Amino acid sequence: MDYLEIKGGKKLFGSVYISGAKNAALPLIAMSILAKNDVVIRNIPQVADIKTLIKLLQNLGAVSKFENLDLVINTTTINSTKATYDIVRKMRASILVLGPLLARFGHCEVSLPGGCAIGARPIDLHLSALEKMGANIEIKDGYVIARAKDGLKGANIIFDKITVTGTENIVMAAALARGTTKILNAAKEPEVVQVCQILNDSGIKIEGIGTNELTIYGGGGELLNLNKICVIPDRIEAGTYLCAAAIAGGEITLKQVEPNHLVSVLGKLSDMGVNFELGDKSIKVISDAKLSPVQIITTEFPGFPTDMQAQFMALACVANGVSTIDERLFENRFMHASELNRMGADIKLNGHIATVSGVSLNGADVMATDLRASSALVLAALVANGTTRVHRIYHLDRGYENLEIKLQSLGADIKRLSE
């Protein structure tokens, strides 16, 4: 099994290109189920979660290939609507095929999902919304079995809690439904916005894009002709490299990035004493690694993203003072705290609040527990005294494309080894 060995103390300099967003690419790949043509998706990140979803669609009968780093996928050959456990268990986002499969074929079976073990991330909101659209749903033998004999119909959906994948699932299902679907308390993350914009460009009228209230005028079951798609830049990967420069010190430039998607992250880094120069599609970050403490509350976009919470905990570990992090979106998302404490961090947990007192860190053997926790350990290792080995980095490979190679190019002393 691979692990990363990192020797701390190196400042970072240079430029790094940000990959396409994994969390944007996943629903776009699932959206291909709604199409009658070859769907071309550009800027696809080469990460494990993407490969898992492509494999899932291939198992359903879809045909896909890469042409010059563009994914070309055709789902007109799908001959099965059962997404089996052996694939779905690897990734929670596999549930994104539920809405498109049901909307197109009127029936499907999707295994209950796996992926990061971050507390309770129920799919009840997806299922209750589909039931309002006329679906009959039962859970049997670990599968969601969904039927809509006469097709899905428009409905008024009110999400009790904002859900990104739930919003994406229902928007895609509504695109082929009969009539109009309204979604209240919809997610408005950039990844959701891109899903809506692409459907809108393909002839499905959607109002309220970028707001908490969406209106989708369904196409009545007619398959879509999807235009060429370019995945938006990964705001979480970008945020992670911003944090890398902040904690290690130095001067790096992020290229192929969307600064407007990072306003809350940039604001908190500024509070910690990090300086920036913003371009149209670039961010230069300048840091002396002397960080001030920070107060963070995770919330939905455009607030501070939960997917950056672990990385900022790493920064707080070496800040000059006491920081607090209030995780309000997911339970049990402080699993990285105990591993950071192995490196000498002073983190105290009280429910969903972490209090972090800044200290000096020392290298240690640590274990990744989920995708973003693994990146926090890498960040801490960049500034720790001595050598750190980060184990179970298959979590990291789920969401970061060539992380160690990109960090090496910036001057970090990091290498991938096998146990």
From Swiss-Prot:
Family matches, as Pfam families: EPSP_synthase
An example Gene Ontology molecular-function term: UDP-N-acetylglucosamine 1-carboxyvinyltransferase activity
Assigned EC number: 2.5.1.7
UniProt feature coiled coil, ranges: none
InterPro entries: Enolpyruvate_Tfrase_dom, Enolpyruvate_Tfrase_sf, MurA_subfamily, RNA3'P_cycl/enolpyr_Trfase_a/b, UDP_GlcNAc_COvinyl_MurA
Binding residue positions for phosphoenolpyruvate: K22, N23
Primary location group: cytoplasm
Keywords: Cell cycle, Cell division, Cell shape, Cell wall biogenesis/degradation, Cytoplasm, Peptidoglycan synthesis, Pyruvate, Transferase
Annotated residues for binding of UDP-N-acetyl-alpha-D-glucosamine: R92, R121, P122, I123, D124, L125, D307, L329
2-(S-cysteinyl)pyruvic acid O-phosphothioketal modification, residue list: C116
Keyword Phosphoprotein: no
This protein's GO CC annotations: cytoplasm
Similarity comment: family membership: Belongs to the EPSP synthase family. MurA subfamily.
Protein name (database record): UDP-N-acetylglucosamine 1-carboxyvinyltransferase
Organism annotation: Campylobacter fetus subsp. fetus (strain 82-40)
Lineage: Bacteria, Pseudomonadati, Campylobacterota, Epsilonproteobacteria, Campylobacterales
